């Protein structure tokens, strides 16, 4: 959730830190700050509540803070209100240490009470200040920065990505990680620390992803990594492939619109390398046909939009594989005592590969003997590293908080997994398989065709942005699609929205429908189109304004009943959500635009949720 960036080199640190934090703004935050070691070996800490611009103005773009080593932080409040005092970096009582932190120190109350009993005075309400004060406490005992860090790590419990500065050791940053993302960047005569590669790709593409329990010492001469026993270790370096421009708006007013428009290319990258001669081929999959045949149960585990991908996947995989498929919210899975064993395949879906709840669910499933296949976007992320198998979506960086192209590519990869496994199991008809593979190859072009309806969607959004409640209804795949459409609308436009299975209308939901209520009726799934139409008639009879989404072949019939119709090209039934989501993304975007919302950075939301 929080953004972290650190720099050790020969250039002025503050402008580099501010630029890095600006590239992390998409993660969401309520305050920001930097700590820079001055030429006189003093810690200069500047922080403020609000947008990063306020911090930049405070330090005149970094010109007021001299020094070539420092750290920056953007904070989402968890412990303590969002204000200047609770913002990071936090400084120890005598000003010797500065700390930035992403995560939650679970035993901070106990540690705080101990330190207070030793005469330490606290300034903030945060859990993070405990780390700074504890560092100084142990440093006063042993006089060694690295040893003090080790002692602190042995005392604290919970999740953390930590960056630490010591005024007595002005040539280094020490970093530590447990259950929160942190990576190291290697440059010529400089070193970098970041929670996300986006912050430092302008300066280096050579990175190492830290694992739990590791400590890193960053200096101008390089970075030394240590394991939890404080023994030196060497790790594989990763080269970031995507371009800096991929994390910039490229002329679009918002990252979200840019990423919606990038979906044809993103899908092409995810699909094309895996289609050969009418077959789906996963060169990067270690699973053997024998192992696939051994699975008698499948769990799909995810959060947010990735969970909605899983909902679509449940319908498609059960149909294709004739296996029981369950979809679980990661935050619930680990506490639900799931029936998981060595004959269970657990498919983990995550854009960032760092979502804490999803990581915890992965570890719980692994502990019970399950085989873990993850579908992630970020190469080398924690989930990717801890899985038995990983399939990358290759969508490129996604900056807007509301996911678009990550959802589309996750769905495409999951559909390909279903088809590939069904072919191995012999549970899919040859003609159905061949048709789906043909349509997969055409999917990027059909998404591009769907994006051509922007003007029509924008006009309809301009007529309906005033609604305070919007309901999505659909059956089967359309219900799963409605869940994602509803989430998109509520998270960026702040309109109350719910998605309901159409067959449940009479069981209570229909009491909410009255004159002028906006209902978005999803009728793309051909086998249940007549059922969808009967539900449309029901809500129209109660005065609803109905915006329908259907296929081109059903447009004429739907238009006879509803107020407005959006269409997508016809395709294989299992792929319809991949097309249907595009108009819903655009509708949400244009509604939020009409309402003047902060589309790329919705209030109270973070791109990657790395705390419970």
Indicate where each model-derived feature is located.
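Hydrophobic alpha-helical scaffolding
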Residues: 7-10, 101, 121, 138-142, ...
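Generic C-terminus detector
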Residues: 230, 545, 571-612
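Glycine-rich phosphate-binding loops that contact phosphosugars or nucleotide phosphates
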Residues: 293-435, 439-442, 524-527, 531-564, ...
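Gly/His-enriched, cation/cofactor- and phosphate-binding structural elements
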Residues: 11, 30, 38, 222-224, ...
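Conserved short alpha-helical segments that host acidic/polar catalytic motifs at enzyme active sites
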Residues: 1-249, 253, 262-297, 335, ...
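Glycine-rich, anion-gripping cofactor-binding loops and their flanking helix/strand elements
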Residues: 183-208, 305, 331-365, 506-540, ...
